[in-house]
Amino acid sequence: MRYLTLEKAIEAWRKLQPLTENDQQKLSRRFTIDFNYNSNHIEGNTLTYGQTEILLLFGKVIGEANVKDVQDMTASNVTLRMMSEEALIKETPLTVNFIRTLHHTLLREDYTVYKQLRNGQQTSYVIHAGQYKTRPNSVITRYGDRFEYASPEETPALMTDLVDWYNQAEKEGKYSPVELAALFHYRYIRIHPFEDGNGRIARLLVNYILTRHDYPMIVVRSRNKSEYLEALHAADLFVGNIPSDGAHASLQEIRPFVQYFKRLVAHEVYTNVCFLTEHDENLWWYDGEKVEFRSSNYSKILMLMMTEPVLTLEHIQQELGINMSAVKKLVNQLQDKHYIERG
């Protein structure tokens, strides 16, 4: 895909408006799979793209799957729908209660985490769904440094500040929607208000902001996780280590992350444009990337699976009108590329 500026990508997107009902459904289905898979995969969820697709579209689990990962993916999709519906009610301001409700829906319930300390002793603590953290949290960076987030004591006030700032900034219109989303994301991450699920909530709220301003929702791809984290780290170097400074950072201070975020939005928006406008029977889309097959039979099999996730070889043979040996070869190649899952 050729490089486009954010402005040109948005212009191309605007030209497609209003979308037909069919295009809206196609885009929504694709985004649902891509967003949930990637946002959870970044955090260690082990479901494959194909398993995620079948789970979210058909409510079925194919192959071996971790029970908690299945539950997390399902809850993620419920939370995505909740966020999407709320974002459309533009007269309603963002509230900390809504953010905490999102978190409760995402985590579903309280649960206990068990860990082994360096001295060999066992420890445990409870993760509270929908409640701010009760213990300090931090991360070890790729450079080996410990990076502290806001303390439990200062978190409620910082979250209130963040939401109040956002609602006021939205009214004033000082920032573009993309700048507003990037700055909110960075400030939120520097607070890290919950003991788990902060990254997933941040990516949901980014799309909440974009949707409120009539921008298409975006996906932070798991395969680009290192670029995402490096952009946050580069901004941290400008802002400094004090959590409250990060929670009130300026757009100028986080410019490495803003630049990254603008490139991300441009790429994702233009990918949507291509997805809706490029029509070829040999073409398929997989996790935000265009796949061009040598034969249309590959994409025909994948299209069949969009309506029926569990197909027999005989059914495929009947639909394609080719011999069984050719069917098996096509299916094996699609499985080897992980475009379809082995049941």
Question: What name fits each language-model region?
Answer:
Residues 1-196, 200-343:
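FIC/Doc superfamily catalytic core
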